[in-house]
A protein has these predicted regions:
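Proteins with a high burden of low-complexity, intrinsically disordered sequence enriched in S/T/G/P/A and R
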Residues: 1-2, 18, 112-117
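Residue-level detector of anion-binding/catalytic polar loops
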Residues: 12
Length: 117
């Protein structure tokens, strides 16, 4: 519905997907980005999935917006130390991030189960 609206109007949707990995205990909620990546500016963070101290977020832009972003806001520099970026990249590349998310989901599901008599 949102995707159709954005496509019809040539508009973009800003989707802040903070906490998406744990907002649904049994399955991740489908994002608008997954349906219409060409119409969505997707924003997310690693502070819930890894640790609150991991103050690292990211933004995925539709291809037509990348050059405009770089022209207007390219002067912004990344404030995340390079070492943390490398560690995070390896965490993702190795599959450990996905395993971490799955472990946390299992723990949350276990916690959400009603107590047995």
């Amino acid at each position: 519905e949102y995707a159709a609206w954005a496509r019809e109007r040539g508009a973009y949707i800003i989707e802040d997907d903070y906490d998406s990995e744990f907002s649904a205990l049994f399955a991740p909620i489908e994002t608008v980005f997954s349906v219409a990546p060409e119409r969505v500016i997707y924003i997310n963070s690693f502070s819930k999935t890894i640790a609150p101290a991991m103050r690292t977020g990211y933004m995925v832009l539709p291809a037509p917006l990348v050059a405009r972003f770089e022209a207007r806001l390219g002067f912004y520099s990344c404030t995340v130390p390079v070492y943390e970026q490398y560690v995070l990249a390896e965490f993702i590349r190795s599959g450990e991030l996905e395993r971490c998310i799955n472990r946390r989901r299992r723990a949350l599901r276990q916690k959400a189960k009603p107590p047995r008599d």
